[in-house]
Amino acid sequence: MAAGVPCALVTSCSATFTGDRLVQHILGTEDAVVEATSSDAVRFYPWTIDNKYYSAEINLCVVPSKFLVTAEIAESVQAFVVYFDSTQKSGLDSVSSWLPLAEAWLAEVMILVCDRVCDDGINRQQAQEWCIKHGFELVELNPEELPEEDDDFPESTGVKRIVQALNANVWSNVVMKSDRSQGFSLLNSLAGANRRVASAESCHSEQQEPSPTAERTESLPGHHSGACGSAGAQVDSIVDPMLDLDIQELASLTTGGGDLENFERLFSKLKEMKDKAATLPHEQRKLHAEKVAKAFWMAIGGDRDEIEGLSSDDEH
């Protein structure tokens, strides 16, 4: 593996669907070039992400077992894609064994993949609750329910959604294209939101016994002194694991070209975020909207001074 090349770590917890097959779906080829390691256990698939905003050289790194993750691989992980067998009631148990590593990597893109949810194994509600708790996005390769044909803003599904999410990530070696860079110039600060959340949670857990029912999506208590206080102040009460990715994509669409495809995707993303916010209680919805507004303003190059003091408690 070339030094300094970021990677999307891909693994499978299914005996019938390998990580290599998933990578081949992502690359759109059954004849992908494989760079074998000396042990021939971990495999690297070089991939050039080249879109209208940027280009980046990354590796799709297939790791069959968590015990094969070396320090070099761990340092390069910027996305994590894991496949599981939804037909087994214990299908998520093997995935959960990867969580300590995933939490240490703090990857901005984490995707849980299956062929489709299964009522006799892991159903949709179980899969989505697990994803919300641990900060993953659920993607079904062959969902039973496809977007309606007359839907003006159909959501991407399957492999297309995985590719879309990987394209929306801000890779460490990204090379921006011409004037596209403005909207991405501050996305690295947005991409650090998950790291700030993790830091705040870590500080809080050291001061208080963790509750067995606590979830990552619960409100983070604020602290008014010490390192934990500064970390807690950097995040809002509502922590949505997918919010950073949504804002990254929204910012890239806003600062992109004015073509029809870009315009349609922009409205589709706005609709997705609106629908997501609509499920929150009123007070949480206000805080959610405030966080999105602030982060999005910074993402497109807005002046921080112009939004200082902006709060849902302000009187207008």
UniProtKB/Swiss-Prot annotation:
Residues 222-232 have a biased composition (Low complexity). The modification Phosphoserine is found at S311, S312. It is found in: Cytoplasm, Cytosol. Gene3D superfamilies: 3.40.50.11960. GO terms for cellular component: cytosol; nuclear speck. InterPro entries: Alpha/Gamma-adaptin-bd_p34. Associated with AP-1 and AP-2 complexes. May be involved in endocytic recycling of growth factor receptors such as EGFR. This is Alpha- and gamma-adaptin-binding protein p34. It comes from Mus musculus (Mouse).
